[in-house]
Amino acid sequence: MSKGNALVKGNALVTGASAGIGAATVRALVADGWTVHMTARRAERLKDLAAETGAVAHVIDAADQIAMAALVSEVPFDLIVANAGAGAAMTALTDAGPSEIAQLVTLNVTSVLQLISAALPGMAARRRGHVITLGSVSGLYPTGSTLYGATKHAVRGMVRNLRIEALGQGVRFTDIQPGRVRTEFYDVAVKDAAKRDAIKETGIDELAPDDVAEAIRWAAAQPAHVNVTALEIAPTDQAYGGARFPE
């Protein structure tokens, strides 16, 4: 990946690539000169994206730790974008059943840890590599979903600690923390149709998947001696924290 401060764009892996931010990231990285591999469960969407971009498709569930570990052992990835994840229904934690809690933690936290654990030894041996995680503003601020927010707090902590754990090995870590993005997220996260429609009709000019993909591309394109540890990106009309008072 690096020679001095130069960046060599080799093999990149994008998980959860069949739609939204993942698909946009595949397009952005291919355009930027990376050899992109992508994973997702939806085979037809991957097939279409592969035909469009030339990226290499692997129909793998990101939660399938054995298959993901096999892939990273076969291909020496210089960049991994751990995008695959899910949103939790925006209900109280006590309304989430044990299976829903376990499923979300497995996909949003455990699968990311396992992927990094499988890839890091090879990156360290080559003394080059970059892992980019998809966090969320929900990992920074209380947004009203305890379960989802907890998983994104975990991802943020993961990246911060990996920066220390892998220090001196030539491996970079970045957590991208988007606000509202125009994707399928709310179709899953909000079960009540009326509430879902109300959220979508707030008038906020949401981020497009391409906006987040550009942030990912930019972080990955920095010189090898530059580590963008975290990047919060949100719509101009969305803000968290503090308080607003009448003028």
PLM region spans:
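Substrate-binding pocket helix/loop in short-chain dehydrogenase/reductase
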Residues: 91-93, 100-103
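Conserved glycine-rich cofactor-binding loop
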Residues: 18-19
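Active-site-adjacent segment of SDR/Rossmann-fold oxidoreductases
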Residues: 161-171
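Residue(s) in the substrate-gating loop at a strand-loop-helix junction
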Residues: 136
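Active-site helix of classical SDR
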Residues: 116, 151-152
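A short, exposed helix-loop element centered on a Lys and neighboring polar residues
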Residues: 116-117, 160
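C-terminal helical subdomain
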Residues: 175-176, 195-242
